Amino acid sequence: MSLVWLEAMLPLGIIGGMLCIMGNSQYYIHKAYHGRPKHIGHDEWDVAMERRDKKVVEKAAAPSS
């Protein structure tokens, strides 16, 4: 009777394992598709700043005539 709690550990372990597998698969799929890990807390402001930075770098790299 002292190992009754062990009966609940198997389903709990399966559920926890599946949650870990789902989280890791999302990470690796996103990394494979975008080429970099997902940014945590990445909002519209960060996206706008990335676009601005990309334009500035392209403008600086373009040959001036």
Curated annotation (Swiss-Prot):
Alphabetized InterPro entries for the sequence: NADH_Ub_cplx-1_asu_su-1
The keyword Signal is assigned to this record: no
Localization terms from the record: Mitochondrion inner membrane
Domain of life: Eukaryota
Main localization (coarse): mitochondrion
Topology within the bilayer: Single-pass membrane protein
Any matching Pfam family: MWFE
Gene Ontology CC: mitochondrial inner membrane; mitochondrion
Transmembrane segments: 3-23
Keywords from the named record: Electron transport, Membrane, Mitochondrion, Mitochondrion inner membrane, Respiratory chain, Transmembrane, Transmembrane helix, Transport
Function, in words: Accessory subunit of the mitochondrial membrane respiratory chain NADH dehydrogenase (Complex I), that is believed not to be involved in catalysis. Complex I functions in the transfer of electrons from NADH to the respiratory chain. The immediate electron acceptor for the enzyme is believed to be ubiquinone.
Subunit description: Complex I is composed of at least 49 different subunits.
Protein family (similarity comment): Belongs to the complex I NDUFA1 subunit family.
Annotated protein name in UniProt: NADH dehydrogenase [ubiquinone] 1 alpha subcomplex subunit 1
Species whose genome carries this gene: Arabidopsis thaliana (Mouse-ear cress)
Classification lineage: Eukaryota, Viridiplantae, Streptophyta, Embryophyta, Tracheophyta
